[in-house]
Amino acid sequence: MSREEPPAAEHPPAQEKTQQQERESQRERERLATDEALALAAQAGIHRLAIPTPFMVGRVNAYLIEDSPLTLVDSGPNSAKALDELEQALATRGHTVEDIELLVISHQHIDHFGLASILARRSGAEVAALDRVAPFLASYGQEAELDDLFAERLMLRHGIPPEVVTVLRAVSAGFRAWGAAVQVTRPLTDGGELALRDRTLRVLHRPGHSPSDTVFWDEQRSIMLAADHLIAHISSNPLLARPLTTDRVGGAPDFVGGAPTAEHETSPTPRPRALVTYIDSLEKTRAMDLKLVLSGHGRPITDHVALIDERFRLHRRRAEKIGRLIAAQPRTAHEIAQELWGNVAVTQAYLTLSEVLGHVDLLLRDGTVTEEEQDGVVRFRAASL
């Protein structure tokens, strides 16, 4: 059984030393580029605050904009450690939590908004976020429960064993404490503006990684605060998620199985085509004139076009590989994930399922595969079979 990333073959000591030197040289180039990019951001009054998270992705980047009002973009997760390090980072800039006047939330993932409620309560800051995500943030506990139900039914429908689903449900329930409901007091609209004294940020909805991904574009300085829309060192996983409440009411693009309905959160179909939507969002960002992209994780990006083109190639190659697996024999999405990555950690099962279904959706869109359901489980087969 082939694997997406097989173990590296053994190399002679001299070759290993050369490869190690190349890796160290690459890391040094990245460090210097990061320092230069962060200095450019600092000149624009934007400062990265790297906040710890309990998740595999590592630290999350919040951004302090020293303007009027004093603005913090994203908060980090709801944990004592995250709050402590955020306070220390603010102190290095001569500020306290109580000084924050505007708190901006980029999207609905808990590593980005978990502390928002505490920060807003302590500072009295306005809380700004895309209008579509405001109901989710205000009712986070109930929304998280519906998210889990949606994920559970989706996993069972695509072949993940019930015992694995049970474990994942428990893990997800444990994660909820890292988030907390928060009331949005300043709803933002796609294409609207967030005006500060010395700059105006254009608000752009860029769904895909999540339904609510929002980026903030300083057109004058050609700087984008992109959160998880674009990350240098990893491909942002377009996670399968329930559509936002307003999308369920007003309609949302790119669904498999028809338009979303009020029952979507408790029904296995239709499901959002997250990767199709994400690629469309990346196309829009690719066309923009940007000098600097400040990401939600990792280092800044200074050539967004090259990075997006690399992501497009990655998705094309993966879709082609999945297409070959399906052409060999009909498979469930879970079977495809096992073929590509083997028996990954149980906690990663939903991530790999999202990855597979995203690329299958590209094949479904192109008409090269079809899907069939038997006994409540979906299998994909080549369209010619």
Name every feature range the model reports, one short phrase each.
Residues 2-11, 16, 22-24, 320-385:
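C-terminal regulatory/interaction regions
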Residues 36-95, 216-232:
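Conserved beta-strand hairpin/beta-sheet module of binuclear metal-dependent hydrolase folds
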Residues 42, 122-123, 289:
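Short, structured coil segments at secondary-structure junctions
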Residues 42-50, 170-178, 197-199:
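Short Pro/Gly-enriched beta-strand edge/turn motifs at strand-loop
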Residues 58-59, 81-83, 90-195:
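Active-site HxH/HxHxD metal-binding segment of metal-dependent hydrolases
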Residues 65, 74, 107, 119, ...:
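Divalent metal-coordination and catalytic microenvironments
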Residues 71, 77-79, 174-176, 180-183, ...:
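Metallo-beta-lactamase
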Residues 124-129, 225-227, 311, 348:
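Short hydrophobic/aromatic-enriched beta-strand-loop microsegments
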